[in-house]
Design a protein with these regions (language model features):
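Conserved alpha/beta enzyme-core scaffold
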Residues: 1-403
Length: 403
């Protein structure tokens, strides 16, 4: 559909949230300035080719950004075949952006027999409200999920004891959030309130651990590209600008937010979107849900990372730094952070004094780097020599700690 539109119009500016595969057509890419509001995996290949304009917008602000910054006047989405009453359904992928249908002048939709009819809020539109329709039947994209590795499982093991029966889950994408979801089989009366519902959460629903009247999401990224009747019957689809509103999300009881990040400093500043000055991802819903969890009664947020990463030359570097390096950005401020978790433990930083934060962060760093981090903190006047002395003797690398 996008290719056809681009062929007929000299210049088309594309503003997109999370799905950019249509731009892989050379006809589209050559003639469409592309603005990404998230910069997902599919978008990153466009960084190398040029023509990508990056933005980092909190997901609950995406519709406002599209309206006020980009002045989007046309919405293009894929929809289901109409039902007996003439309603087209946005399905498990398109509902996230459906709020835009009230903000634009034109709605050009592609009917796809493989798009499924979902339930929820603002999840459908009557055919009479659509400017133009075309048709292209094709299977929906499938999403491959890497199974959690041993390190992911170690990180999840520090979170699982802090999740209670009856809590409400928001988990992100990746090995660590998947490990958390898999580890919750056997729990009771859990709710799911998440922007992206993944295969791991679908399996959690099927395990019996979830109260099926408490499942809401904006996007479903399933491995099959097709939801079964069980999932369709129990997932309520909500536009992302509505679901991610921190004030709405905070109404969920015991909101548990689990997301990944790239690095953090000793005071708890978290970078989840840039490496060496290059935008790698976007803020997405991380900050939305960190703030929502803090407001939720009994809520907790967990930002997770491996304690180290290995450079191409084999050099091991700590992902916990005394200070964020040049080129890093602060995705989640330290004043919002609750828990930061590595394979070495979970550091509870919420409203803690700076020296307490620094000691907690050093304890969850890899043992090889703890002494050096403590010395840097002393040199910067952030930690007293007496407090730093506890890190002079390092535990064995296999020893785990919890703060």
């Amino acid at each position: 559909m996008l290719t056809c539109v681009v062929r007929g119009i000299p210049v088309v500016t594309v503003v997109n949230g999370t799905e950019s595969r249509a731009l892989s057509d050379p006809v589209c890419f050559a003639r469409t300035p592309y603005h990404s509001l998230f910069l997902g995996r599919a978008d990153r290949k466009f960084q190398q080719r040029g023509g990508l304009h990056e933005n980092s917008v909190q997901f609950h602000q995406t519709v406002r950004a599209a309206r006020e910054v980009y002045r989007v006047n046309t919405l293009m989405l894929e929809v289901s075949e109409p039902d007996a009453d003439g309603y087209l359904y946005y399905g498990p992928r398109g509902t996230a952006w459906s709020s835009l249908d009230t903000q634009v002048e034109k709605r050009i939709y592609q009917v796809n027999a493989f798009q499924q009819r979902t339930r929820g809020e603002h999840h459908r539109i009557h055919v009479s409200e659509v400017t133009a329709l075309c048709r292209a039947d094709h299977p929906l994209n499938t999403y491959y999920y890497k199974a959690p590795d041993a390190l992911d499982a170690r990180i999840a093991a520090h979170i699982l004891p802090l999740v209670r029966d009856g809590d409400t889950l928001q988990v992100g994408i990746g090995g660590i959030p998947n490990a958390v979801a898999y580890g919750l089989h056997g729990r009771k009366r859990l709710g799911i309130y998440t922007e992206v519902l993944t295969q791991a959460q679908l399996r959690l629903m099927a395990s019996g651990a979830v109260d099926l009247d408490r499942v809401e999401a904006s996007i479903v990224l399933d491995a099959a590209g097709h939801l079964d009747d069980f999932a369709l019957a129990h997932i309520r689809m909500i536009p992302v600008d509505v679901l991610n509103d921190p004030f709405r999300a905070a109404q969920q009881p015991g909101l548990i937010s689990v997301n990944g990040c790239l690095m953090a400093d000793l005071t708890g500043q978290v970078c989840a979107e840039a490496i060496d000055g290059r935008q790698y991802s976007g803020v997405g819903g991380q900050l939305d849900f960190v703030r929502a969890a803090a407001r939720s009664v009994g809520g907790r947020s967990f930002l997770c990372l491996h304690s180290t990463h290995e450079a191409p030359d084999g050099t091991l570097t700590s992902n916990i730094r005394a200070h964020l390096p040049s080129g890093a950005v602060v995705t989640t401020p330290r004043s919002d952070v609750m828990y930061i978790v590595t394979e070495w433990g979970a550091a509870d930083l919420h409203n803690q004094p700076l020296e307490t934060r620094i000691c907690a962060m050093i304890r969850i760093a890899h043992p090889r780097f703890r002494c050096a981090l403590a010395q840097e903190a002393v040199a910067w006047g952030q930690l007293s020599p007496e407090c730093a002395a506890q890190f002079d003797t390092q535990p064995e690398p296999e020893e785990e700690e919890t703060t």
